[in-house]
């Protein structure tokens, strides 16, 4: 799909379809008002007939509107004028695509980005429009013999802005939106790939591909032999039950004006399949454990978006690839592991493996002297119980960093909710035989997992995102969501603006 922005008036435009918004109570958007005036009150008379009441999700296709050069006009319901939310706006964009795809239209000019969405600027309206449109078009049919049919003939959408002053912000929104939408697609494709294909070596291969595609990126791969030399014994213990060796992929993006500037580090949990190990998971929905590398997929997609946006930052992305399987060589409940930073961990449950992989990865990244570290992980079902599937869990030992992430999440409409950490939760991680236990009991599971990780992040500013409830959807619409790429990309955009 080709996207562009322009600033023109309704009467000047000659395209296959104009797209304008109509609110409830017969209220017209500003573009619809212009169209109504040019057409001699055609829209006013039409609305009085009651064929469209302006509810979110409605649409009405018109042909040969008087005094309008365009062949078609699509009216899209936008709800109540002063109450339009980001979620409703995205639904409006999806309905627009559904209606257009039912026609032979190849090019359309869209005025819906003029809508007032919680006082968002044109930048955000363009961002959300493109992200929504690309999400609505996404299909993963790589392994289907019969590919999904291309729905509709639309190949170009031109977003019209109110004036020339808005064009610069609109173009910036366009650039960022296309990069972020592309990153989300990369993340979805990685996460949706089946685990017999997408193993730790596959993650490493894709990571190396970014270095081929972008001159600002260099990638190196840490294999199991190097991990053993480094003392990454917790990471290796998780991997030892699998025939697929672990690989830690290090993606370095260097584009800061000061080459010595401290990097932002993103660490993604990359369990390409998590059977639970000896503490075997129930078979019901175990297929979805291919999504246990959603954190790595998000980091991969974010690095793609970052390279497309060419932000003036230094960023390191870590894909902590591993597989957790039951086997005669698998690690056991009762094992005591010596982590890379020297702390010992008693394994009480082999299905609490993500934190064991991450604790060594979080120690590994100390070598970068990072400005901050954010780990992203489908870490706990407990986070889903606490927050559902709408908000990712946010935990941090640094309030300023947590506030930055919360702000970026709100801006990007990629929501998070902060959960506490503290010494009270550390008590739950006590072991009779080691420095730490790898689980903290029945209560507060998402928090105790974050608390466990905090023991390995003492040398830098750190935050943890638990995306177990947001990285993928189950049911009829099963598939990866691409989250939290928008949040992470926005965090990096904000950091770049501070430089």
Curated annotation (Swiss-Prot):
A GO term, aspect molecular function: metalloaminopeptidase activity
A Gene Ontology BP annotation from the UniProt entry: proteolysis
Subcellular location: Cytoplasm
PROSITE patterns for the chain: CYTOSOL_AP
DNA damage recorded as keyword: no
A Gene Ontology term for the protein's cellular component: cytoplasm
Manner of cofactor binding, per the entry note: Binds 2 manganese ions per subunit.
Binding site for Mn(2+) 1: 274, 351, 353
Residue numbers annotated as active site: 281, 355
Positions contributing to Mn(2+) 2 binding: 269, 274, 292, 353
InterPro entries from the UniProt entry: Leucine_aapep/pepB, Macro_dom-like, Peptidase_M17_C, Peptidase_M17_leu_NH2_pept, Peptidase_M17_N
Pfam families named in the record: Peptidase_M17, Peptidase_M17_N
EC code: 3.4.11.1, 3.4.11.10
Catalytic activity: Release of an N-terminal amino acid, Xaa-|-Yaa-, in which Xaa is preferably Leu, but may be other amino acids including Pro although not Arg or Lys, and Yaa may be Pro. Amino acid amides and methyl esters are also readily hydrolyzed, but rates on arylamides are exceedingly low; Release of an N-terminal amino acid, preferentially leucine, but not glutamic or aspartic acids
Signal sequence residues: none
Cofactor requirement: Mn(2+)
Chief localization: cytoplasm
Keywords from the named record: Aminopeptidase, Cytoplasm, Hydrolase, Manganese, Metal-binding, Protease
Family in the record: Belongs to the peptidase M17 family.
PANTHER family reported for this sequence: CYTOSOL AMINOPEPTIDASE, LEUCINE AMINOPEPTIDASE-RELATED
Function as written in the Swiss-Prot or TrEMBL entry: Presumably involved in the processing and regular turnover of intracellular proteins. Catalyzes the removal of unsubstituted N-terminal amino acids from various peptides.
Protein name per the record: Probable cytosol aminopeptidase
Species of provenance: Haemophilus ducreyi (strain 35000HP / ATCC 700724)
């Amino acid at each position: 799909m080709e996207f562009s922005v322009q600033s023109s008036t309704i009467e000047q435009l000659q395209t296959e379809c104009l797209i304008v918004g109509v609110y409830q109570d017969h209220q017209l958007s500003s573009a619809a008002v212009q169209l109504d005036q040019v057409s001699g009150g055609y829209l006013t008379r039409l609305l009085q007939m009651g064929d469209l009441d302006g509810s979110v999700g409605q649409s009405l296709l018109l042909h040969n509107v008087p005094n309008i050069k365009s062949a078609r006009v699509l009216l899209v319901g936008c709800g109540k004028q002063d109450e339009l939310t980001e979620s409703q706006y995205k639904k409006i964009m999806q309905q627009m695509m559904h209606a257009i795809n039912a026609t032979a239209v190849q090019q359309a000019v869209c005025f819906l980005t003029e809508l007032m969405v919680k006082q968002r600027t044109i930048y955000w309206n363009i961002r959300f429009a493109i992200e929504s449109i690309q999400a609505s078009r996404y299909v993963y049919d790589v392994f289907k013999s019969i590919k999904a049919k291309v729905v509709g003939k639309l190949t170009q959408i031109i977003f019209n802005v109110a004036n020339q002053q808005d064009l610069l912000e609109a173009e910036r929104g366009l650039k960022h939106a296309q990069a972020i939408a592309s990153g989300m697609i990369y993340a979805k494709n990685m996460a949706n790939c089946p685990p017999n294909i997408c193993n730790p070596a596959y993650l490493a291969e894709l990571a190396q591909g970014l270095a081929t595609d972008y001159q600002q990126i260099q990638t190196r791969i840490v294999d199991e032999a190097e991990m053993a030399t480094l003392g990454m014994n917790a990471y290796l213990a998780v991997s030892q039950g699998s025939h697929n060796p672990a690989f830690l992929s290090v993606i370095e993006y260097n584009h800061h004006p000061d080459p010595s500037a401290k990097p932002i580090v993103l660490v993604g949990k990359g369990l390409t399949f998590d059977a639970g190990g000896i503490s075997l998971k129930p078979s019901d929905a175990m297929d979805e454990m291919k999504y246990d590398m959603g954190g790595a997929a998000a980091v991969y997609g974010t690095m793609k978006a970052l390279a497309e946006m060419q932000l003036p930052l230094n960023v390191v992305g870590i894909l902590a690839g591993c597989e957790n399987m039951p086997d005669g060589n698998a690690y056991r409940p009762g094992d005591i592991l010596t982590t890379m930073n020297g702390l010992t961990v008693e394994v009480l449950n082999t299905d609490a493996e993500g934190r064991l992989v991450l604790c060594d990865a979080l120690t590994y990244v100390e070598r970068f002297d990072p400005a901050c570290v954010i780990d992203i992980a489908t870490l706990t079902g407990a986070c889903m119980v606490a927050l559902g599937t709408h908000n990712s869990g946010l935990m941090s030992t640094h309030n300023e960093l947590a506030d930055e992430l919360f702000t970026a999440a709100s801006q990007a409409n990629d929501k998070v909710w902060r959960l506490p950490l503290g010494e009270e939760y550390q008590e739950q991680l006590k072991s009779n035989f080691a420095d730490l236990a790898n689980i903290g009991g029945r209560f507060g599971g998402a928090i105790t997992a974050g608390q466990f990780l905090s023991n390995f992040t003492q040398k830098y500013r750190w935050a943890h995102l638990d995306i177990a409830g947001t990285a993928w959807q189950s049911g009829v619409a099963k598939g990866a969501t691409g989250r939290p790429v928008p949040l992470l990309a926005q965090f990096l955009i904000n950091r770049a603006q501070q430089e």
